[in-house]
Every structure is written in C-alpha cells, then in structure tokens.
C-alpha cells in the first residue's frame, strides 16, 4: 500500500508529469490523432523540464550569493526555504502529507467540477509542500488520525481553488485573456501587489515601456540587463565579503571579477531558459486543456507555476527581484537591531515571489506599482515568518522555515484557529474559506 501511495505521490508532485497527464487526457477527449496526442504530451513534458532546468540554473547561481552575503555582513539567522523545511518534515509527516495531497487534489477537482471556481491547481510540488505544511500544523495542534487527513484535504482543496480565483482579475490584465490562472502559494503577495499597484493606476507607465538612451539601447533586451545587474550585485557583494574569502571558499581560486561576471550571466541564462519553457508550455497546454474544460470539468482553467507570467513583463521580473531583496536586507537589519530571531533574505524566494509580485503590481500601476508591489512582498516574507515560527513545533528550531506568503498567512490564521479552538477552529476556518469562495464567485467573469 505504501509503495502504491509513494508511486502516486511521485507522479502528482512532478509538475511535468502531472501537466502532461492533463494534456494527454485533454487531447484524447478531443479525439485528436495519435500523432498529435503524442506530440502534445511530450512537448508539455519538455516545456516543464525546460522551465525546471532554468529554475535550477537560477537557484544554483543564487546559492553562492547567499553565502557571500551572510559572510559579508556577519549575520546568522533563519533562512526561509520551502525545500529545506519540507525535507525535514517528511521524516515524521511523510505518509500523512502524501494522503493529504492526494485527497486534496480530488477535493480541488470536485470544486472545479461542481462550483464556479473552475481552477485546477497543477503546480504539483507546491501542492505537496502545502500538504506537508498542513500535516505539521494539525499534528502540532494535537489533531491526529483520520481527522488530520480529512481536514487537511479540505483546507488544501479549498485554497487551491480560492487563491487562483483571487488573482484571476489581475491575471486577465497580465495575459490579455482568460485561458490560464496562477497556481503558486505566493498568492497573498501577488494579490497585495496588485492592490497597492492599483493606487498608481494611470500615474506610471509600464515597466516594458522604459526608454533607454540611444547608447544604452542594448539594455532593452532583458537578458543583457539582467546579466549586467546581477554581475554588479555579485561584484559588490564580493567586495564586502573580501577577495580572499571569495577565492578560498566560493570561487575555487577564480578571480572574483570573472566569477561575478559568470554568475551574473548564468543567472540571466536561467531566466532565459525559464521563459523558453513557459512559451512552450503555453503553446501546448492551452489547446490541450480545451478537452478538459469542454467535456470533463466544464470551463475549467489550469493554474500554473509563477514563471508563467514572466514573459509578459520581463523588465518587471528584474525590478521585482532587486526591490524585494533590498527590502528584505533592510528588514533583516531592523530585526537585528531589535534583537530576537533574524530572518535572512532567502534569495530564491525574493526572486520568484518578488518578480511575480512586480508583474502583478505593474499590471495595475506600471513602474511605481511594480516597485511598491515588490517592496511589499519583501516586507511580508521578512516579517511574517516571525509570527509563524511557533506553529512549527520542534521544527521551529531548525534555522529554516517556509518562505512563501500563503504558507505563512495560512499558517498564522489556521494555526491560531486550531491552537486555541481545536477541531472547532479547523471547521470554522474551512467555513470562512468556503464563504470567501462564494464571495469570489462574481469576480470570475471576465470584465467587458
């Protein structure tokens, strides 16, 4: 039984396989020729593997930056990282998390089939992280046994339907259509970025309309501007950390200037690969998903990972990362001055959430909206972990925590509910999220 469960989880937690399976079913339902089904399925897998490869390149290029930064400023503290905290949690909560994930995805599909929230959440690894997260919260709050699975699955299925719905009005502005949704557990940041961006509506041009002097026109190409910006960030960080430290501990004796340049261009290459993968996914999943939306789950939409929005505002991606990270650094020093736990800037989280928040802010309020939205994200992912740490139980001392805002906000609200009210608090939370779903019903119709 455990082997079967592990096999199912392995499939569902791999976005490439999960989305390819959806594309495969969609093409079969449309009665496409075998050649089209094979091509569409393989291209969907290929698109996600390309996206994942790009994300890995970005993450690997950022890892040395985090080490350099910590050494440069001599700060020790908690580094938010989803993968790290989940890997620790699986030792004690693995089976429970797997069952919550499988049952939660079923709940999500049932909600999409029988309600007006037509979003099928396809970011498999994030679904698994949230399942592990819920297993921790419920167990620490002494809700155990089958109740953990039932409550966890209901909460997971509901938020996988509600959060994409919350973002869809701005997603329509970003993409110019209503064919795809965003399925990523940084939704609170993105919604907040869109809301703060709305304050600058009509007051600022889009990030994609930035005009460069003729001599700097090459910076209009995002890959080049990202390369230069990241190389400069690395160069400055290396100077603060000390050349000897870079040579001995980071660059394997490579000159720190050359090292900075290579890391900056590597980061840009990762972003370029991500964008290539996104374009391939969109070209395949949207037509294939028509079979699902027309026959099996009428009018449903795929909710996909956050890089899906990067091609629509590539300048905002760079602005968002930079602003969110700088905000996180400022927040770190504020926490350091006040004593207590210090949240170090998680570079990966600041990139993916900050970039996406800036895209949402830009859609509503142009450049000012992008900057404000990314800064707000930086504040949220720096200070919210402090409120969330008590709900991790014994894992709270692991020097890491969840990094994305939905984990943190759901953890704080849901964690307090079950901590002080037990099972009743969990049920009350489910009712409130369900009521939110009803209120969101009117937001799902495209504006004329």
Regions found by a protein language model. Name each.
Residues 63-81, 289-310:
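Membrane-interface interhelical connector segments
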Residues 47-98:
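Membrane helical hairpin/interfacial module
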Residues 79-99, 298-322, 393-401:
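C-terminal halves and exits of single transmembrane alpha-helices
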Residues 113-117, 306-386, 390:
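Hydrophobic alpha-helical bundle architecture
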Residues 73-79, 97-105, 125-132, 153-157, ...:
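Mid-membrane cores of alpha-helical transmembrane segments in multi-pass membrane proteins
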């Amino acid at each position: 039984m455990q082997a079967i469960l592990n096999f199912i989880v392995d499939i569902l937690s791999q976005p490439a396989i999960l989305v390819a399976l959806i594309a495969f079913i969609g093409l079969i339902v449309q009665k496409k020729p075998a050649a089209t089904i094979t091509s569409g399925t393989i291209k969907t897998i290929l698109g996600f593997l390309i996206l994942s490869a790009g994300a890995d390149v970005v993450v690997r290029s950022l890892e040395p930056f985090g080490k350099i930064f910590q050494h440069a400023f001599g700060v020790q503290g908690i580094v938010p990282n989803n993968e790290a905290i989940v890997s620790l949690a699986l030792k004690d909560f693995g089976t429970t998390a797997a069952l919550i994930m499988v049952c939660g995805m079923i709940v999500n599909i049932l909600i999409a089939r029988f309600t007006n929230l037509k979003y099928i959440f396809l970011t498999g690894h994030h679904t698994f992280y949230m399942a592990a997260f819920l297993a921790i919260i419920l167990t620490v709050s002494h809700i155990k046994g089958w109740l953990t699975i039932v409550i966890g699955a209901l909460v997971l299925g509901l938020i996988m339907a509600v959060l994409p719905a919350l973002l869809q009005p701005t997603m329509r502005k970003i993409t110019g259509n209503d064919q795809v949704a965003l399925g990523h557990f940084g939704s609170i940041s993105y919604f907040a970025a869109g809301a703060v961006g709305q304050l600058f509506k009509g007051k600022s041009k889009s990030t994609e309309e930035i005009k460069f002097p003729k001599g700097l026109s090459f910076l209009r190409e995002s890959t080049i501007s990202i390369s230069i910006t990241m190389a400069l960030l690395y160069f400055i960080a290396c100077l603060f950390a000390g050349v000897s430290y870079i040579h001995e501990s980071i660059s394997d004796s490579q000159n720190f200037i050359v090292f900075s340049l290579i890391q900056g261009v590597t980061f840009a290459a990762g972003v370029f690969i991500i964008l290539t993968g996104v374009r391939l996914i969109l070209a395949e999943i949207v037509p294939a998903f028509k079979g699902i939306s027309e026959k099996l789950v009428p009018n449903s939409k795929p909710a996909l990972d956050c890089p899906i929005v990067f091609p629509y505002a590539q300048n905002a991606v760079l602005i968002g990362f930079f602003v969110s990270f700088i905000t996180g650094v400022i927040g770190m020093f504020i926490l350091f001055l006040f004593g207590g736990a210090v949240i170090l800037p998680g570079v990966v989280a600041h990139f993916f959430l900050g970039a996406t928040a800036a895209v949402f802010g830009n859609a509503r309020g142009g450049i000012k909206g992008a900057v404000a939205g990314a800064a707000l994200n930086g504040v949220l992912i720096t200070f919210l972990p402090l409120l969330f740490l008590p709900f991790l139980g014994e894992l709270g001392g692991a020097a890491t925590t969840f990094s994305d805002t939905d984990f943190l906000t759901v953890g704080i609200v849901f964690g307090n509910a079950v901590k002080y009210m037990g099972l009743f608090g969990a049920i009350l939370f489910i009712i409130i999220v369900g009521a939110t779903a009803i209120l969101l019903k009117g937001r799902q119709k495209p504006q004329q």
